[in-house]
């Protein structure tokens, strides 16, 4: 017997999907840069794996208050300008490369609109193809024009990131290469003006929102099929109806059921993800795919491979997803 609440939530999702039916095609995103080259491989290797449509270089974790920008790409490099050639190779393969701002550690914050203005100028000049202005230009990744900026803000005050987003979109509006903004809010940040990134996401400027459905017990999958799926579905539906048309929502999940030292709640076995989640939500025009945390764990578990092989013909990065009503045999 299927719980009534479960059916109601699934019905809401499916009704929304039918209203906005489109050819739902998703991609896989991941984060690279927080482990050594021996542990997670190079950026070039990640791109050549043919697993990912989007790769976030993590992290730019010092910015704001008029300071110079600083990267923390753990164990890979101190002088990371050589990555410029790897980034260009990735882009030539169709992989979109983002620079992720924030992370769990660092010294970053925006205190005023002027602060957000300056950081936007620094990013534009250093990573996005803008003018190489003296005092602003820092070629930390070499001479590159990245595809996008990702916000994974986890510490400091939550204000001013909406201003940063507006400034970045304005600065990049005339460039030839499309510019993308992405954000990685916690699933519980929905409709919470005090939460990281909610106010920014409300601007409607974020092309990709890869919501973290992990480390957040109120809205993540919690192993028990009925209760775990209900929490996920309710949160997914809330986020779907809140996003502006054209924004894509990706499922942010860990590629392993534990970190080095402690459980990483929210892990979804790939068979559950494929058969009981993606197959239900993929008809929404806002479905954008899956964001896997992170390249290191993905290499250990081959998690992305298990998703791709379920849905994709050999040789393509994208997931043309099948239609299936989860409760057809209920």
Swiss-Prot record:
- List locations, semicolon-separated: Secreted
Which region ranges are annotated with the description Binds to IgE in 70% of the 10 patients tested allergic to Indian jujube and latex?
72-86, 300-311, 309-320
Q: Which InterPro entries match?
A: Cts1-like, Glyco_hydro18_cat, Glycoside_hydrolase_SF, Glycosyl_Hydrlase18_Chitinase
- According to the record, the signal peptide region is 1-24
Instruction: Extract one GO BP annotation from the record.
Output: amino sugar metabolic process
Disulfide pairings: 47-90, 77-80, 187-219
What's this protein's family per the entry?
Belongs to the glycosyl hydrolase 18 family. Chitinase class II subfamily.
State what this protein does.
Defense against chitin containing fungal pathogens.
Q: What is this protein called?
A: Endochitinase Ziz m 1.0101
């Amino acid at each position: 017997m299927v719980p009534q609440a479960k059916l109601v939530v699934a019905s809401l999702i499916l009704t929304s999907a039918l209203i906005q039916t489109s050819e739902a095609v998703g991609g896989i995103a991941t984060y690279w840069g927080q482990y050594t080259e021996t542990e997670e491989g190079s950026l070039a290797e990640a791109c050549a794996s043919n697993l990912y449509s989007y790769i976030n270089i993590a992290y730019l974790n010092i910015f704001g208050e008029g300071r110079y920008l600083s990267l923390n790409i753990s164990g890979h490099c101190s002088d990371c300008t050589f990555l410029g050639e790897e980034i260009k190779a990735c882009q030539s393969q169709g992989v979109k490369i983002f620079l992720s701002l924030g992370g769990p550690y660092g010294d970053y914050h925006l205190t005023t609109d002027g602060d957000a203005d300056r950081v936007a100028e620094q990013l534009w000049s250093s990573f996005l193809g803008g003018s190489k202005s003296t005092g602003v230009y820092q070629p930390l990744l070499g001479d590159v024009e990245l595809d996008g900026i990702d916000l994974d803000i986890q510490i400091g005050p939550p204000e001013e990131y909406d201003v940063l987003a507006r400034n970045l979109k304005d600065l990049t509006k005339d460039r030839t290469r499309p510019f993308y903004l992405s954000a990685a809010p916690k699933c519980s940040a929905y409709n919470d003006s005090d939460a990281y990134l909610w106010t920014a996401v409300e601007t409607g400027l974020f092309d990709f929102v890869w919501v973290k459905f992990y480390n957040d017990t109120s809205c993540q999958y919690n192993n028990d099929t009925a209760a775990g799926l209900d929490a996920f579905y309710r949160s997914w539906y809330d986020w779907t109806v809140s996003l502006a048309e054209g924004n894509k929502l990706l499922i942010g999940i860990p590629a392993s059921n534990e970190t080095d030292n402690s459980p990483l709640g929210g892990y979804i076995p790939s068979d559950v993800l494929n058969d009981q989640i993606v197959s239900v939500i993929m008809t929404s025009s806002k479905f954008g795919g899956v964001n896997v945390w992170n390249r290191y764990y993905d290499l250990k578990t081959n998690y992305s491979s298990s998703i791709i092989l379920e849905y994709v013909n050999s040789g393509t990065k994208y997931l043309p997803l099948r239609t299936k009503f989860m409760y057809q045999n209920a």
